[in-house]
Structures are given as structure tokens and as C-alpha cells.
């Protein structure tokens, strides 16, 4: 117990430190934290919050980090005094109880990884951490020294939030200088995952390494592909490919040696999960995986079509559950980069080839649709712009990440493509969602290099290069104008979306790069 004195907890009844999967499973059952499915996958409810609470996330405003953080609606400041008050409150919540302490690494690169210690009173949250982060070896655990500590006091709420000037009873706070995060009022496991991701997005660029919200895989010829996109755009699904080894499904770094996963697991959406379309993910849901907010039938089988709790049903599992994963969790420099957008307006083509400058423009734009349930208050797709395809997790100015990406694209001669996994034939409510089959055909053509041999035409207003024909995709789909019955509505919607891009990009024109790249966007 003595080695845990620095946690600042009083009268701890018992500490369960780095439990095995079997031990965690036994604790989950003994604590009545959820149910087991028909194939012995444990299944939990995350309570009121079935997605992240972005309006309740704060960074402590203090030097030296305050001069690097891009303060605003996303990176909200909080005082050191208020942080101390809420940390004390969280520690009081965790004191006098049985607690779970789970140690893990974030980052598969030895030169870039961080050692993180998670403290919680809920067994399934320790299980989630064990699934999602990199599991240290026995020797590494014996010599483990935490770079960062996360106190997850999910049962603790801040009743004084109004007088404290905060958004709600929920709080997710990061103290960069003290290397501590504290979570209160939400049980959603994704807060821990994305919280440490946010910290990696602070640390790495300051070391001239790029941190990315993307998935990554590697082919038989060691050709690496990166897939950028917000939650629900298909990153996990499209990067899970039987012909390619999965490096990771969500968070990566890119340094002088190549690409490396931050995580040791995957966090996949399960709504309408179909074993035919997504056999790898379906097969990964077995003992040691952890299902969130799904509905069980009477026979304990999972009804993946049931969204009565949330559209954002999820499963976390160790990456070893994907048969075809890259065991080292890292690879060389990318050959192809794919930006995924779920276009709710049905305007963007299924696939477009981007120049380096256009790549910077669309990376900074980060256009997609927020898909139902990945955040509180979103019940249907809503068009949005999220810098770097992950603005909620980027503490620094977006152009810091864009500059690093541009340098790496140029240095390693990377091909960049924009792929629309959203709507075709009309906007949301009129058109239909692009089929996974068509999207897969576009991705395959990029990865096998056959798209480079296509004849391209210009997609007007957006000035994107789109293929005239592509194997496995109906030719009418390739140019969106052909899929809309009402051509006037199409032109009107196209111009409306182009205008939104232009308006959004004005926020970057306070810096040199922003002005430079603005000319590579749509021309109204």
C-alpha cells in the first residue's frame, strides 16, 4: 500500500492493482456492474452519459502551458484553485473504498510513449483501460513510474457548478504542469481514452512529432495507410481489412521512424453491426471485450440494431482480438493518406485526389457530420467542421498540426485522397448513405494503386480531381451531380456547402498558413 501513498487517498480498504482479465471479470460480476452475453462478453451501461461531455472539459490555465494552448470553446480555462477543489472532492469520493489501479502505456514508440496510472472505484473502468491502452510486460510493471495520473471519480458530482462558473455537475479537467487529470459525474469510458489522447496532442507536437486522430494499417508490401475522420465516419470499419495488418483504429503518432499506435485496443461503434460487412469487428466481440450500452435479448444474445439506449453503442477490445493486427503496433512512413468525411449534404464525391495544398486545406477544414450519439445532444447527423478531423482533442492551434502534416507529406511523397462515407443522391433525409461496398472499392483502388491509372475530371466549384470510372463503383456515383434527381437543388446545395467551407476557413486567416491555404478551397 505504501507505494500508493502519493495518490493522496485516505483509509483505502483495498487496492486491486493491475488485475488480470479473469480477475476483472470476477470483480465485475461480484459488484453487479453489468451482464454477461451468450458468448461471455461483459456488457455495461454507462448511465446518463453515453457519449463524451465536451462542454465539461477544461485545462488549468497556468504557465508555461497557457502560452501553447489554443484557448476557446474547446480548450476551456479553469483556475488552479478550482482544480484543487474538485481534485480534493474526487479524492474524497475515492477514499475509504476498494479501488482499482491500472497502469498502462500510451504510445508504441519507446521514445514517445507516456506511462499513465488510472485510479477508479469501478472494475469495468479498469477493464476498459486494460483494453484500450498498451499493456505493459511484467518487467515493465515492476519498474512502472507514472508520467501522468487519472483520477476517475465518476460517482462524484460538483453541486456548486453554477457558482463555480462551470457548465454542469460533470467535470473533466487536465492539469498539464502537475500531470494529473480528474473526472467526475460521468461514467462514460471514452472520457479516459480521449483525455489521454488530448494530452498526447499537447506533448508530441512540442517535440516536433505529429499526433493524429486517425486509424492506420499496413499492407503485404509494408505500405502504410492512414485514415482520418471523426467518430462514426468509418475509420474503424475501413481500416479493419483482412488483406492488411491493423496498426490501430483511432490514435497515432508520426515521428522520424514512422507511424505508431497510441493504444493497445480498439473502440468500435456497434450500432447495426453486421457479421457479413464487418466480420473482424464482429469476431472481436468475445470474452475480455467490453460492450457498452447495448441491449440484450432474453437469450443473452446482443441486439445490435436496438438503439433504445443510444445510437453510440460501443465495444472495446484488446487489439489481439483482431487476427490480422500488426503486433509491434507501429510501421514505417505512410504511402497513402485518406480523409473520411460523412457529408450530410450529399455533395462531396465518393473519392477525390488532393494536391498537397488541398490536403492542408481539407485537413484544416476537417469537414464531416456529427453522427448520432457520439456526443450529448446530437440525435441526427449535423454538418460540422472540426480542425484536423479531431478538434475537440487538439489543445494547440490547428495550424501547428497542419504544418507538421504538410512537412511530412512533402518529405515522404505521400498520396492524399478525400473519401465521402456520407450521403449520395441528396442531403440527409432525401439521399441515402453511401454503401460500405462502394466505399471499400474506392479504398481498395487507392491502396492497390489502380486509382492512379484512372482518367480524372474536375469536380466544379470544389475543384477536386475525381475519377471518371473506377472498378467496383457505379460510374453515376462518382460525380454527385449524376445522383441527384433535382439538379437545381443540387447546385443550390453545392454552393451552400462551398460557402460554408469558405466561411469556416476564415478563422485560420489570422496566421500565415491559413491565408496561404485558403486559396485551395472551393471557388464560389
From Swiss-Prot:
Binds 1 Mn(2+) ion per subunit. Pathway: Carbohydrate biosynthesis; gluconeogenesis. It is found in: Cytoplasm. ATP binds at residues 194, 213, 229-237, 278, 314, 439. One of its GO terms (biological process) is gluconeogenesis. One of its GO terms (cellular component) is cytosol. Its cofactor is Mn(2+). Pfam families: PEPCK_ATP. It catalyses: oxaloacetate + ATP = phosphoenolpyruvate + ADP + CO2. Involved in the gluconeogenesis. Catalyzes the conversion of oxaloacetate (OAA) to phosphoenolpyruvate (PEP) through direct phosphoryl transfer between the nucleoside triphosphate and OAA. Belongs to the phosphoenolpyruvate carboxykinase (ATP) family. PANTHER family: PHOSPHOENOLPYRUVATE CARBOXYKINASE (ATP), PHOSPHOENOLPYRUVATE CARBOXYKINASE ATP. This is Phosphoenolpyruvate carboxykinase (ATP). It comes from Campylobacter jejuni subsp. jejuni serotype O:23/36 (strain 81-176).
Amino acid at each position: 500500500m505504501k507505494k500508493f501513498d502519493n495518490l493522496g487517498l485516505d483509509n483505502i480498504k483495498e487496492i486491486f492493482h493491475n488485475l488480470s482479465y479473469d480477475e476483472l471479470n470476477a470483480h465485475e460480476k461480484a459488484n453487479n456492474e453489468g451482464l454477461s452475453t451468450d458468448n461471455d462478453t461483459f456488457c455495461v451501461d454507462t448511465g446518463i452519459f453515453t457519449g463524451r461531455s465536451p462542454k465539461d472539459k477544461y485545462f488549468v490555465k497556468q504557465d508555461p502551458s497557457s502560452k501553447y494552448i489554443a484557448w476557446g470553446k474547446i480548450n476551456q480555462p479553469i483556475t488552479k484553485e478550482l482544480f484543487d477543489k474538485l481534485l480534493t472532492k474526487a479524492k474524497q469520493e475515492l477514499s475509504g473504498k476498494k479501488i482499482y489501479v491500472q497502469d498502462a502505456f500510451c504510445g508504441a514508440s519507446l521514445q514517445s510513449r507516456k506511462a499513465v496510472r488510472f485510479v477508479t472505484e469501478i472494475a469495468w473502468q479498469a477493464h476498459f483501460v486494460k483494453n484500450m491502452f498498451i499493456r505493459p510486460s511484467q518487467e515493465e510493471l515492476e519498474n512502472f513510474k507514472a508520467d501522468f495520473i487519472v483520477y476517475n471519480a465518476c460517482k462524484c458530482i460538483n453541486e456548486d457548478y453554477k457558482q463555480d462558473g462551470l457548465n454542469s455537475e460533470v467535470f473533466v479537467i487536465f492539469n498539464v504542469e502537475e500531470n494529473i487529470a480528474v473526472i467526475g459525474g460521468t461514467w462514460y469510458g471514452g472520457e479516459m481514452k480521449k483525455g489521454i489522447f488530448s494530452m498526447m496532442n499537447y506533448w508530441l507536437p512540442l517535440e516536433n512529432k505529429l499526433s493524429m486522430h486517425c486509424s492506420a494499417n499496413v499492407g503485404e508490401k509494408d505500405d502504410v495507410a492512414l485514415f482520418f475522420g471523426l467518430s462514426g465516419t468509418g475509420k474503424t470499419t475501413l481500416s479493419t481489412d483482412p488483406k492488411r495488418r491493423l496498426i490501430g483504429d483511432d490514435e497515432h503518432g508520426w515521428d522520424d521512424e514512422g507511424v505508431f499506435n497510441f493504444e493497445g485496443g480498439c473502440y468500435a461503434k456497434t450500432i447495426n453491426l453486421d457479421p457479413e460487412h464487418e466480420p473482424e469487428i464482429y469476431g472481436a466481440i468475445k470474452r475480455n471485450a467490453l460492450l457498452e450500452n447495448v441491449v440484450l435479448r432474453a437469450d443473452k444474445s446482443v441486439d445490435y440494431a436496438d438503439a433504445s439506449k443510444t445510437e453510440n453503442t460501443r465495444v472495446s477490445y484488446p487489439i489481439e482480438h483482431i487476427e490480422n493486427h500488426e503486433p509491434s503496433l507501429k510501421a514505417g512512413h505512410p504511402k497513402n493518406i485518406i480523409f473520411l468525411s460523412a457529408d450530410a449534404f450529399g455533395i462531396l464525391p465518393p473519392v477525390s485526389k488532393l494536391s498537397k495544398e488541398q490536403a492542408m486545406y481539407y485537413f484544416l477544414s476537417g469537414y464531416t457530420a456529427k453522427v448520432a450519439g457520439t456526443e450529448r445532444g446530437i440525435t441526427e447527423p449535423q454538418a460540422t467542421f472540426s480542425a484536423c478531423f479531431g478538434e475537440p482533442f487538439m489543445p494547440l492551434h490547428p495550424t501547428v498540426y497542419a504544418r507538421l502534416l504538410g512537412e511530412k507529406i512533402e518529405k515522404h511523397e505521400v498520396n492524399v485522397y478525400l473519401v465521402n462515407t456520407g450521403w449520395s443522391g441528396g442531403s440527409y433525409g432525401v439521399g441515402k448513405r453511401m454503401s460500405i461496398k462502394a466505399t471499400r472499392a474506392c479504398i481498395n483502388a487507392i491502396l492497390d494503386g489502380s486509382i492512379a491509372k484512372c482518367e480524372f475530371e474536375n469536380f466544379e466549384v470544389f475543384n477536386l480531381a475525381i475519377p471518371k470510372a473506377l472498378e467496383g463503383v457505379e460510374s453515376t456515383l462518382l460525380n454527385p451531380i449524376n445522383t441527384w434527381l433535382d439538379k437545381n437543388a443540387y447546385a443550390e446545395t453545392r454552393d451552400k456547402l462551398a460557402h460554408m467551407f469558405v466561411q469556416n476557413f476564415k478563422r485560420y486567416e489570422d496566421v500565415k498558413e491559413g491565408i496561404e491555404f485558403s486559396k485551395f478551397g472551393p471557388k464560389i
